[in-house]
């Protein structure tokens, strides 16, 4: 029987670190995490309180405050230095954080798919991550027929290879995964060897904006929650299309901001401010909408373009990640992992806030390359 998670007792005081003078959503955090007790909290524009669970928490807060970096504003017009800086940050973030994620959540580094309103355990969350893969395949009408199923698959932004190995087993397919993180690529390959898949699955460090594959190589092009890291969304999509074989299916599951109304030219200032804070910690360039992706696909004459907002189906995910981080195992692993991971953990409540305010959308976009 598995041991129950150990949460910090209610007497432990947890304050909210306020980066750039912005208050995290205390009410949403409390509603999701009843085991946590917040200290008396009176919002001001100048306080920079920190988690006070450890004696050195002030040092942690000072380091976090010092690490607040400018938002990456990369528009794809040749800002090579900024792109390199962004990609270096992404690689280092995942080099540092992938181990703790695997230890607590397993080898699938993405949201789960849940029935709305359900209460789920950690085991259910891992099942939900597999369901996310299956729901995306179903939405894209990927066939299980032995004569029609994909035989060559690329996993763009593969993490530690959870999806790639799943596809290799499900379809008996050859799978290639790419990531910016050397740590992820090495771990993904080690897991493939451990599962006896080294002959069909391989991983390498590569840039999704310049994939190391020839034209038209893959029957299924898969991108699970990597598009949000791409500084040039059009170039990213063009590369997905380039490596896709004629008739191939392309699946993009990604974070987007809400679609703009016909009268809007941009998000509201407070919405953009929220996203900027998330960008700072997760090494994200400027966000785009689902409609922006669709326009790119239409401009490239892709067929059977479909889109859906699955935000309601991923609602339990971020509260669950916060809960797992606040178990003794999760918290001590987090503290050991490094500053980039700690910084990322501190903005998790902003993801909850962004979804609740309908600023953030969890989007799935699929299409087919013409024959």
UniProtKB/Swiss-Prot annotation:
Keywords: Alkaloid metabolism, Chloroplast, Membrane, Methyltransferase, Plastid, Plastid inner membrane, S-adenosyl-L-methionine, Transferase, Transit peptide. It catalyses: picrinine + S-adenosyl-L-methionine = ervincine + S-adenosyl-L-homocysteine + H(+). Residues 216-224 are annotated as: SAM motif II. Gene3D superfamilies: Vaccinia Virus protein VP39 (3.40.50.150). Its EC number is 2.1.1.-. Residues 1-65 form a transit peptide. Residues 153-162 are annotated as: SAM motif I. CDD domains: AdoMet_MTases. It is found in: Plastid, Chloroplast inner membrane. Pathway: Alkaloid biosynthesis; vindoline biosynthesis. Its main location: plastid. GO terms for biological process: alkaloid metabolic process; methylation. Residues 243-252 are annotated as: SAM motif III. It comes from the Eukaryota. One of its GO terms (cellular component) is chloroplast inner membrane. GO terms for molecular function: S-adenosylmethionine-dependent methyltransferase activity. S-adenosyl-L-methionine-dependent N-methyltransferase involved in the biosynthesis of biologically active monoterpenoid indole alkaloids (MIAs) natural products including vindoline. Inactive with picrinine as substrate. Belongs to the class I-like SAM-binding methyltransferase superfamily. gTMT family. Homodimer. This is Gamma-tocopherol methyltransferase, chloroplastic.
């Amino acid at each position: 029987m598995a041991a129950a998670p150990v949460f910090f007792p209610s007497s432990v005081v947890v304050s909210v670190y306020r980066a750039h003078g912005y208050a995290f959503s205390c009410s949403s955090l409390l509603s999701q995490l009843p085991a946590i007790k917040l200290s008396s909290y009176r919002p001001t524009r100048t306080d920079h309180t920190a988690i006070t669970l450890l004696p050195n928490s002030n040092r942690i807060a000072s380091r976090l405050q010092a690490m607040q970096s400018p938002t990456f504003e990369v528009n794809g017009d040749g800002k090579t230095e900024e792109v390199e800086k962004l990609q270096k940050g992404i690689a280092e973030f995942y080099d540092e954080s992938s181990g703790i994620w695997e230890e607590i959540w397993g080898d699938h580094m993405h949201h789960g798919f849940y029935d709305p309103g359900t209460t789920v355990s950690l085991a259910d969350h891992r099942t939900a991550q597999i369901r996310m893969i299956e729901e995306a395949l179903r939405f894209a009408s990927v066939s299980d027929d032995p004569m029609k199923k994909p035989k060559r698959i690329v996993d763009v932004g593969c993490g530690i290879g959870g999806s790639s190995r799943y596809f290799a087993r499900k379809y008996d397919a050859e799978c290639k995964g790419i990531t910016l993180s050397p740590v992820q690529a090495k771990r993904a390959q080690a897991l493939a060897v451990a599962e006896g898949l080294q002959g069909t699955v391989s991983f390498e460090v590569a840039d999704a904006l310049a994939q190391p594959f020839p034209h038209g190589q893959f029957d299924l092009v898969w991108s699970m929650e990597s598009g949000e890291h791409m500084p040039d969304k059009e170039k990213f999509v063009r590369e997905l299309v380039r490596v896709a074989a004629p008739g191939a299916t392309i699946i993009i599951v990604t974070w987007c901001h809400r679609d703009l109304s016909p009268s809007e030219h941009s998000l509201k200032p407070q919405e953009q401010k929220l996203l900027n804070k998330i960008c700072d910690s997760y090494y994200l360039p400027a966000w785009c909408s689902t409609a922006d992706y669709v326009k790119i696909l239409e401009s490239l004459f892709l067929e059977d373009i479909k889109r859906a907002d699955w935000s309601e189906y991923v609602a339990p995910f971020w509260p669950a990640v916060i809960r797992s981080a606040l178990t003794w195992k999760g918290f001590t692993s987090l503290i050991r992992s490094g500053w980039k991971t700690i910084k990322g953990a501190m903005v998790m409540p902003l993801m909850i806030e962004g979804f609740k305010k309908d600023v953030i959308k969890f989007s799935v976009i699929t299409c087919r390359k013409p024959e």
